């Protein structure tokens, strides 16, 4: 009898040990140079996970490279956060999270790779993920924002992911650039968890900026950059207090400067961000491989989409003029707004100046209407919205001659286009 009892106990223990680990929130982010590196972010419920990667199309996984995460830490940022579940019921979320991050380096430019999240025995815990490294002279990306993924209203996420597919059907792209507010409450771990289950996160590299919704929790006063830091793995090359939320990366000929609107709300922090940007752009232009284009991204809008009033345009335009920024992208206002190239407050022929553009919302729920343009009539060339139920996104095509941005509606119809000309850099920054 004792032998039988011992056998049952050992069998139960063996069964418990055999239970697979759980992982979630897998996403591919760029390394500082996306032609040779990528950064993988994921979460696990226990230690011991890793990554296996290989060239896309290579047979089997037996020769794949296995790597352990360079960071795997217990995350408490989401503990006891007040939220709602998918049924709309009030809950306090208490997830068990080991936040993992890994940088893949020495990759081949312009090459597609595949990877799996695996356990310590190299058994798969995830579906197959893929990404394309930079390196092609011509490439495309999809630009989207403000879909406020909210599990009690799943149609928001469905609308945005369908819009991404619509952009892909119009012009096949290599990766996705988002301009913030991808979740309704950044403090709700379950919202991120549900969003990252979508197919589009398995198929592309994603780069983005933090929005105010990504920063905040359901309750007033709950907000931190750690919500973004623990759901992504962006390069740690921002200024010290803001690393992995403010950051920069190269994709082909473009230097992307990614700003944190939630930090840049005081004169002191804006001064820090501008000094950091001057250093990044100056070093890049002085390097042996200077960027052809500089693109700045943030969440908060340059102009009020309803009235045309200057918002962050007045805070940043002189710096953009000074640094020769080619394109400034933003979201937040839920209304599409764009200028032609602007330099020192005047529209130019495109040989100098910055094109300012802000994206519409894409969730079919939180769009806004426009009113008569009251300010900046000479600068703002196009506005667009479908009202409350707005869905839109952009195709961005880059080659050595120009960046072509095309706004599409939910039906894949072209609403607006603007071209950003490549400019000759006549002088280098000191």
Specify the residue positions occupied by each region the protein language model found:
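Acidic, histidine-bearing metal-coordination/catalytic regions of metal-dependent phosphoesterases
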Residues: 20-143, 148, 169, 389, ...
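Extended active-site neighborhood of metal-dependent phosphoesterases/phosphodiesterases
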Residues: 91-94, 98, 112-130, 189-287, ...
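Conserved, compact domain cores that house catalytic/ligand-binding motifs in diverse enzymes
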Residues: 138-217
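Bacterial N-terminal signal peptides
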Residues: 7-15
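Bacterial N-terminal signal peptides that target proteins for export
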Residues: 1-6
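Active-site-proximal segments of metal-dependent phosphoesterases and phosphodiesterases across multiple
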Residues: 151, 263-269, 287-328
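Acidic/histidine-rich helix-loop elements
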Residues: 59-95, 141-161, 227, 231, ...
